[in-house]
Amino acid sequence: MDARAIPFDTRRDCEAQFLAVVAAAQHSLRLFDPDGAVFALGTIQVNAALRAFLQRGGTLRLALHEPGHIERHCPRFLRLLRDYGHACECRQSPKNLRQLSDSFSIADEQHVVRRFHSDHMRGEASFDDPRAVEVPHHRFEAIWEASRPTLHPTTTGL
């Protein structure tokens, strides 16, 4: 673990670090999780933080294996996608990548929160540390390129 890394092992600490990464983001947010549940995208607090980020001109990319959790439990996030469709994109990974079981969020290629396995809350956050972001960033780009668009918010879809 990097000396600047902040370890966590509870949902509360993970969510706090995720919100800190969103708050630190100026230009880009890149999120990967098997179902998006760890990011608490349906909560008022996360919705407000993401809206503030997008209002500042940021862009959001979310990659996941299955969109069902977000479709069923995150109407605020679906409204955010509708309201900021020009700045947000979500993609679903292909079946050959479904074994990937970690989770991470990256802001501006400077800040990262990552869980080592999606079944556990254990992970770490690093801020103002481009070296800590290198591997997750390359992994995200590879996942993104292999994935297809999902979560298309439409008037009939909401």
Predicted regions mapped to residue ranges:
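PLD/PLD-like phosphodiesterase catalytic module centered on the HKD motif
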Residues: M1-R30, P34-L158
